[in-house]
């Protein structure tokens, strides 16, 4: 008889076996598989790793379970699709990586991950650049009176100038905002921008006791730079940026 497969949501600190009032994938109950004072939070599943599709419904279920657990527990989140085909192997991995998992729990205890994305305002940026460098305005005026071949050359020159100016502009605001936020955050991580207008795509680890301080700083920066850049601030989110659970539990696949 094949052993029961289990879908893994996260690891939490607990010395008690728990059954949560939560609905997991395939409508299954969510419960713990324990080792000492930590546990993997799982639900039974019939699918293999290859068969578990990241449908909108499945992704939402995964996220809702994590969000519910985050209210009362320090959570080391697993990304979608981590499935164990052996309960014994899962417990062996909890034992093997117990010191590392405990270190992560200690790092994340009473802390929260927040996401900060910053986008530049095109018109405000161009207006500021033109105000600081009259060469760009001069080239734009010259182009209006030039023949097409010469105008195209001027456009290339203007494009190169704008690209260089934008890079410096982005670096200036990125540095200012990120460094200000790091004055309150315990840790931070810079991720790749999601599009051309996204100049900051970062995650910050913040003490829950300083959540309001961080909120106030976001408001202050938004007021200070709001005509040039826009903030998107999301909290709390599962701390994926500060723990890579798959690195340790991928052996269950």
Locations of regions flagged by a protein language model:
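An interfacial alpha-helical scaffold signature
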Residues: 1-232, 236-253
